[in-house]
Amino acid sequence: MESKALLLVVLGVWLQSLTAFRGGVAAADAGRDFSDIESKFALRTPEDTAEDTCHLIPGLADSVSNCHFNHSSKTFVVIHGWTVTGMYESWVPKLVAALYKREPDSNVIVVDWLYRAQQHYPVSAGYTKLVGNDVARFINWMEEEFNYPLDNVHLLGYSLGAHAAGVAGSLTNKKVNRITGLDPAGPNFEYAEAPSRLSPDDADFVDVLHTFTRGSPGRSIGIQKPVGHVDIYPNGGTFQPGCNIGEAIRVIAERGLGDVDQLVKCSHERSIHLFIDSLLNEENPSKAYRCNSKEAFEKGLCLSCRKNRCNNLGYEINKVRAKRSSKMYLKTRSQMPYKVFHYQVKIHFSGTEDGKQHNQAFEISLYGTVAESENIPFTLPEVSTNKTYSFLIYTEVDIGELLMMKLKWISDSYFSWPDWWSSPSFVIERIRVKAGETQKKVIFCAREKVSHLQKGKDSAVFVKCHDKSLKKSG
């Protein structure tokens, strides 16, 4: 807890100077003079994903042919975010390579606004309007000069770049097909009006990944509120597995706030790597589930795919446009491939135990036709007699069709005389499980008719019920 508190203090110091930067910008210029466009547009190739070797120059038609732009294919426009170094970050060529691997005949354009992006954050935040204006004028020129269909255009913006993409989409003559916001920046944009930030109106379809929304609104690195048609919050959107808070604090303590970018990079940049994962692992897309809150999701209450309640994360997302933004959640692994398998578990505790047990630790093991996943930890905030509890667990491997499960109640880490003298226990007759990825429901019965789950003792074993009446699921 102290580490988390220190992290928030550090971020607070870093963000304290951020004040709203109000820089107006006119609608995309319909004139033919493009000399004032400062952003550069590099068409990278599958052979050289790391270098800007050929630039498309608005107003110069020859530059488009010289770069071998494919007029019959999709175009991806990648817009980077704020930078401390003034150089491209390592994710840029990785995303370019993944896009080309998935769509070999496409055009992948990288927008260079590095000079504007390396200014003091509020200044760079204000520049997103100018960058968006540059991008819109470039797209409009391509459409007017070459009759290039904007239905083939997909903008991908990271951090501040997501808002630049939104501004661009709002200023094009026709709507572009899609904008993907990769953890859009929060400071200066959380309370901004739609014209100056990413919003659902900026493209035919807008999907957003939120991966670092830790902190109070307006001061979190990534924007917290939904800003697309579908907004996905992996691992609740606050912090990502594998991103070490303690290590980040140690780096800041040793090197100062100059390395604050290292603090935000892991979770903030995870949005990009999740999207890259969706490009490279198309056969096994991660599944996200619509839910009113991350708390409800953690209880396993949202693993439904009825009426578009679930969707694929990333490139193969289903373009669902509801009147209100859909907030969706999922769990992920700490590294690629990020896909996990979600399960809702419902257990009814009965017996003669008096009172409530608070913050109780358990372990559950699942055994299937393909593999097994053992000793998955979970904690129930409270446990009492004659109540049913629902919670979410997930496995990092596909275990196939569920066959058996074990449940263990972990003893407290501290010594307790009552537990030593007589361990509390509950009676469990059956456990209900729903698999999110397959939507299958299974009821498990105690192997010995009823199972006595005792704290700190052996696991209780449950097998699939054979009574047909039980398979009507609940």
Curated annotation (Swiss-Prot):
Gene3D superfamilies: alpha/beta hydrolase, PLAT/LH2 domain. Residues 243-266 are annotated as: Essential for determining substrate specificity. Keywords: Calcium, Cell membrane, Chylomicron, Disulfide bond, Extracellular matrix, Glycoprotein, Heparin-binding, Hydrolase, Lipid degradation, Lipid metabolism, Membrane, Metal-binding, Nitration, Secreted, Signal, VLDL. Glycans are attached at residues 70, 386. Pfam families: Lipase, PLAT. GO terms for biological process: cellular response to fatty acid; cellular response to nutrient; cholesterol homeostasis; chylomicron remodeling; fatty acid biosynthetic process; fatty acid metabolic process; low-density lipoprotein particle mediated signaling; positive regulation of adipose tissue development. It catalyses: a triacylglycerol + H2O = a diacylglycerol + a fatty acid + H(+); a 1,2-diacyl-sn-glycero-3-phosphocholine + H2O = a 2-acyl-sn-glycero-3-phosphocholine + a fatty acid + H(+); 1,2,3-tri-(9Z-octadecenoyl)-glycerol + H2O = di-(9Z)-octadecenoylglycerol + (9Z)-octadecenoate + H(+); 1,2-di-(9Z-octadecenoyl)-sn-glycero-3-phosphocholine + H2O = (9Z-octadecenoyl)-sn-glycero-3-phosphocholine + (9Z)-octadecenoate + H(+). The active site is at residues 159, 183, 268. Homodimer. Interacts with GPIHBP1 with 1:1 stoichiometry. Interacts with APOC2; the interaction activates LPL activity in the presence of lipids. Interaction with heparan sulfate proteoglycans is required to protect LPL against loss of activity. Associates with lipoprotein particles in blood plasma. Interacts with LMF1 and SEL1L; interaction with SEL1L is required to prevent aggregation of newly synthesized LPL in the endoplasmic reticulum (ER), and for normal export of LPL from the ER to the extracellular space. PANTHER family: LIPASE, LIPOPROTEIN LIPASE. This is Lipoprotein lipase.
